């Protein structure tokens, strides 16, 4: 199902539809938010990827309990709000579409660096996470991503991270790899929208769209999602 206010979002000529069905899940997810990821290089802001985050509909009833009375600004400024999205007991789906070309090594090493930094700051970097990072890097090792190609992640509450690839903006029917590590699955999303997330624009989009959805009649009723 889709609610009237769940619309598509266009980021740098990449249009993310209101709903998707990931290749490894029987569920349809709604578009929670999207934005650009870029870096300030000298005096120019260089845009590298367009990032979107989809959530299972159950996320609305879970998140609204604590956050439905908050404004968009309050949600945007709250690290705990984004932490609740990252760790919540519902599926998440992220799509990263290239604006600039990147190699698999360039992309995966930066993500891995961000994940390890998160774990070290929390004192939870163990051999299990180091092994998961090695698996993550190996999935991307020999790949290249031209503009318009996409990397897709599905995060399951049971702790699995499913990785898929697409030559364009479409959702593939097959998966490329599954890594069973809960901390890694959460850290990949955390690196996008967490406290030091790489896409402030995506965070702003999430806060705005979810703030409005929380206030829609019936949206936060779990029965309305069945």
UniProtKB/Swiss-Prot annotation:
Q: Where are the transmembrane segments?
A: none
Functional pathway: Secondary metabolite biosynthesis; flavonoid biosynthesis
Keyword Isomerase found: yes
Q: Which InterPro entries match?
A: CFI, Chalcone_isomerase, Chalcone_isomerase_3-sand, Chalcone_isomerase_bundle_sf, Chalcone_isomerase_sf
Q: What else is known?
A: Part of the biosynthetic pathway for all classes of flavonoids, a large class of secondary plant metabolites, many of which are brightly colored.
Q: Which family does it belong to?
A: Belongs to the chalcone isomerase family.
Official protein name in the record:
Chalcone--flavanone isomerase 3
